[in-house]
């Protein structure tokens, strides 16, 4: 926690990037494990909460004031098409769970990879100061890469 506050207040980009990267890896792993559970759509509220928390912590690490509004605006700014693609991906993830064992494994991978894509976009925008349009392209590109 001391490292986080130091990086936040000094706006030390390398420290912020390191901490955000650690958050990204941790949340992606946790979401991947949550996505392994075999009941379709039961993990969706947990995943959404974890992903929102991850984005909020990345915003906090960047030194900006955190609030549900800012996180919501960022998620909305990624684009309606990205949200629709994410929703379709979640639907496919739920459907594939009906395949014993492998369905849950693929679902866990997609949950972790989707969280990773969202976190990379948040880091690009809030830590690296990447323009919003470029951040959208990065997010969409990462989502296209993960085909279950």
Model-derived features with residue positions:
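C-terminal end of P-loop GTPase domains and the immediately downstream helical coupling element
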Residues: 1-25
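Residue-level signal for secondary-structure boundary elements
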Residues: 2-5, 32, 36, 130, ...
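Charged, alpha-helix-enriched surfaces in structured cytosolic catalytic cores
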Residues: 19, 113, 134
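Hydrophobic alpha-helical transmembrane segments of membrane transport and translocation systems
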Residues: 119-148
């Amino acid at each position: 926690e001391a490292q986080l506050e130091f990086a936040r207040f000094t706006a030390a980009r390398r420290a912020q990037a390191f901490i955000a990267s650690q958050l990204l890896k941790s949340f992606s792993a946790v979401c991947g494990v949550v996505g392994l559970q075999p009941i379709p759509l039961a993990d969706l509220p947990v995943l959404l909460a974890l992903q929102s928390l991850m984005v909020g912590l990345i915003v906090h690490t960047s030194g900006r004031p955190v609030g549900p509004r800012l996180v919501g605006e960022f998620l909305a700014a990624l684009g309606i098409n990205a949200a629709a693609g994410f929703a379709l991906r979640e639907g496919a993830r739920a459907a594939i769970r009906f395949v014993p064992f492998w369905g849950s494994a693929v679902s866990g991978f997609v949950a972790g990879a989707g969280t990773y894509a969202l976190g990379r976009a948040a880091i690009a925008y809030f830590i690296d100061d990447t323009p919003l349009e470029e951040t959208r392209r990065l997010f969409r590109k990462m989502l296209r890469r993960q085909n279950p």
